[in-house]
C-alpha cells in the first residue's frame, strides 16, 4: 500500500511539474534512485562487498539502455504519434538492455 501511495505521489508530482515553466524537470524525477536504493540495500545486506560493487558497476552501465530509449524517443516523436514513439523507444530500450545483459554475462562469466 505504501509503495502505491509513493507511486501515486510521483505521478502527481510529474503532472504538476509538466505544467510549470520548468516542465523539463519532470524528466529528472523518474531518475531518483528509489529502486536502486532498495536493490543496493538488499544486495549489500545479503551478499559480499564485492557482489555489491559488481551490482553498482552494472548499474553504471545500465545508463546506456536509458540513453538509447531517450535518443530513440527524441528521433521518433517527429515521425510518429506519441504512443507509437513511446512503444518503439521502449522496444529500443529492451534491445539495448538485452545486449547489455548478454555482453555482461559473456564478459563476467
Swiss-Prot record:
Give the knockout phenotype: Mutants are pleiotropically defective in alginate biosynthesis from various carbon sources.
What GO biological process, any one, is recorded here?
Answer: alginic acid biosynthetic process
Q: Where are the transmembrane segments?
A: 24-44, 56-76, 85-105
According to the UniProt record, one GO cellular component term is: plasma membrane
Q: Which gene encodes it?
A: glpM
Q: What UniProt keywords are attached to this protein's entry?
A: Alginate biosynthesis, Cell inner membrane, Cell membrane, Membrane, Transmembrane, Transmembrane helix
According to its UniProt entry, the function of this protein is described as: Could play a role in alginate biosynthesis. Overexpression may be lethal.
**What is the official name of this protein in its record?**
Membrane protein GlpM
- Using the record for this protein, list the coiled-coil segments as residue ranges, or answer none: none
The species is: Pseudomonas aeruginosa (strain ATCC 15692 / DSM 22644 / CIP 104116 / JCM 14847 / LMG 12228 / 1C / PRS 101 / PAO1)
Q: How does it sit in the membrane?
A: Multi-pass membrane protein
Q: Please name the taxonomic classification of the source.
A: Bacteria, Pseudomonadati, Pseudomonadota, Gammaproteobacteria, Pseudomonadales
Fetch the InterPro entries from UniProt: GlpM/YdgC
Entry similarity comment: To E.coli YdgC.
Record-linked Pfam families? GlpM
What are the subcellular locations of this protein?
Answer: Cell inner membrane
Amino acid at each position: 500500500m505504501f509503495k502505491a501511495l509513493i507511486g501515486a505521489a510521483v505521478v502527481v508530482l510529474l503532472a504538476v511539474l509538466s505544467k510549470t515553466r520548468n516542465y523539463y524537470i519532470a524528466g529528472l524525477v523518474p531518475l531518483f534512485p528509489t529502486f536502486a536504493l532498495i536493490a543496493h540495500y538488499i544486495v549489500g545486506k545479503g551478499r559480499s562487498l564485492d557482489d555489491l560493487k559488481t551490482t553498482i558497476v552494472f548499474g553504471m552501465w545500465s545508463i546506456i539502455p536509458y540513453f538509447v530509449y531517450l535518443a530513440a524517443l527524441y528521433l521518433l516523436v517527429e515521425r510518429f504519434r506519441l504512443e507509437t514513439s513511446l512503444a518503439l523507444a521502449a522496444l529500443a530500450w529492451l534491445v539495448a538492455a538485452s545486449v547489455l545483459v548478454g555482453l555482461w554475462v559473456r564478459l563476467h562469466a
